[in-house]
Amino acid sequence: MKFSPLVDELIQSLRCLPGVGPKSAQRMAFQLLERDRKAGAKLADSLAKAMSDVGHCQSCRTFTEETYCPICVSTKRGHSDIICVVETPADVLAIEAGGHFSGRYFVLLGHLSPLDGVGPEELGLALLEQHLASGDVSELILATNPTVEGDATAHYIADMAKRHELMVSRIAHGVPVGGELEYVDSTTLALSFNGRLPI
């Protein structure tokens, strides 16, 4: 059955969200149109405002409505000499939720992927290089994802940082807390053994 052009456009628009296929998009569209038009209008308004007003921090590249994000302007953290490099703004939120890091961030907004046309320029590495050359950074923590692309990105940035004689470290990878060994893949298990710590 074919829907009206506006309903069909709404369904197709919702499919741009990660993990949303045709059926899920249809259910969402129908929910908003049948039962919750007020929430649909609020969603449309919030989406329009976010798309027009949210940009990237001029220092770390995370999301913000201002020129600089709250972490970069913080008197406690904005002058930290430790920078943690992550792939996405969601990674910043995950680390912040843990509450164990009190330095600054640099958000790559992706990872090196030459086949997809993503090189150092797209990741803002010239800006990161400026931070490293400023003399205000003593340590770089690489928190890219443990994927082939994440590893390649981490190695590229580590080489860049070593030219500035900075301490460079990479977050540990291994068995998650509460995980059972029989369900852990062999690569993760190997990383866990290689990165074991004395107790």
Curated annotation (Swiss-Prot):
A biological-process GO annotation: DNA recombination
Highest taxon above the source species: Bacteria
Domain Toprim per the UniProt entry, residue ranges: 81-176
Membrane-spanning residues: none
Zinc finger (C4-type): 57-72
The protein, known as: Recombination protein RecR
Gene that specifies this protein: recR
Pfam families: RecR_C, RecR_HhH, RecR_ZnF, Toprim_4
Organism of origin: Shewanella halifaxensis (strain HAW-EB4)
Recorded GO MF terms: DNA binding; zinc ion binding
Keywords: DNA damage, DNA recombination, DNA repair, Metal-binding, Zinc, Zinc-finger
Cited HAMAP family: RecR
Family of this protein: Belongs to the RecR family.
Function description: May play a role in DNA repair. It seems to be involved in an RecBC-independent recombinational process of DNA repair. It may act with RecF and RecO.
UniProt keyword Zinc-finger, yes or no: yes
